[in-house]
């Protein structure tokens, strides 16, 4: 599908196509926040695990809903918080969405809480450390 916006032509994928979901996931990994955050967080000491959760991860995994306004990021470890926020601000400029990091120690992440149970029971996009 395409449409004109001023002098630009905007092209979007057809969600009814069987190729839509696989192509969306490929683009998300190679050119989206997953790739940018993976590269940036690889340079920060103390990060054991990092992943995108919330509505952005859900839409990327094919869960229906409204388009996400921001990116929720879970960082597990003992990184320098200012380095985490600095990386998030830099990546925000490229993805044109605010990134909201939550930083937890490994013990805090292992604890049982309603918030963490919700995070664990919904789709994620791994950045560092793989799936939950």
Describe the predicted segments one by one.
Residues 1-49, 57-68, 76-132:
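Catalytic core of pol beta-like nucleotidyltransferases
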Residues 54:
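Active-site glycine-centered loops adjacent to acidic/histidine catalytic or metal-binding residues
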């Amino acid at each position: 599908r395409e449409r004109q916006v001023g002098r630009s032509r905007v092209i979007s994928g057809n969600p009814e196509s069987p190729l839509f979901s696989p192509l969306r996931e490929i683009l998300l990994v190679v050119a989206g926040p997953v790739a940018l955050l993976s590269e940036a967080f690889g340079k920060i000491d103390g990060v054991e695990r990092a992943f995108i959760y919330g509505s952005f991860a859900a839409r990327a995994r094919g869960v229906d809903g409204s388009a996400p306004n921001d990116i929720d990021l879970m960082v597990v470890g003992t990184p320098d918080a200012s380095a985490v926020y600095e990386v998030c601000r830099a990546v925000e400029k490229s993805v044109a969405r605010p990134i909201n990091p939550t930083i937890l120690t490994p013990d805090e992440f292992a604890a049982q809480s309603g918030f963490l149970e919700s995070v664990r029971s919904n789709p994620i996009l791994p950045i560092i450390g793989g799936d939950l």
